[in-house]
Amino acid sequence: MLVLPGLGADDRSTIAIRGFLERLGYQVRGWGRGRNVRAPDADVSAVAAQVAKLREDSGLKVSLIGWSRGGIIAREVARQVPINVRMIITLGSPFAAPGASNVRTIWRLLTGQKYEPPTPERVSRLAQPIPVPSTSIYTRADGVVAWRACVEQEGDERENVEVNTTHIGLGFHAPALWVIADRLAQPPGIWKPFHPGPMMAPWFPRSRRSSQK
């Protein structure tokens, strides 16, 4: 599997996620492309090629985990080469409204360049469901992106899981890591929605609210 960092971050930011998954016995790779500050289309093409090589070498479809902007790239890779992708898991990724964030300020600070917002056509495409199973992990206390922009159109093999942390905390938050592990543990070709169960439900705000109705 492949773990993609957020805007301005590199593989060092995903060490906790990758280390956690390696301890569970998975073969995990960082994206190996330095800081995530390039034009997204270039990254999508490069990661798609990387995914194709990983599948060729292993004979298995590749799961992609993307944090923030990395999740947007991961989803577009799945849209481009779904035959090579097993599932997508995103962490605080504003694919439903990519402009609903502090990205303009962050981009200018990181690159010294003016942020060029995506075209209406691209915004519309990013929000469309992808053709592989997907789980969006989000938090209402994000602080960087608007949480509603991270919410998927729920349907067959598409879901949203709410946790209680910050945008920066998503890659270290135990419940978020547990969701990732739970999703990856499903047998190939079989997908069921995430259910924390009564013991873990208090750690998941959406489940807690549902149980109180």
Write out the residue ranges for each language-model feature:
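Helical cap/lid subdomain of alpha/beta-hydrolase-fold lipid enzymes
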Residues: R79-K213
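Serine-dependent carboxylesterase/thioesterase catalytic core
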Residues: M1-R12, A16, F20-G34, R38-P133, ...
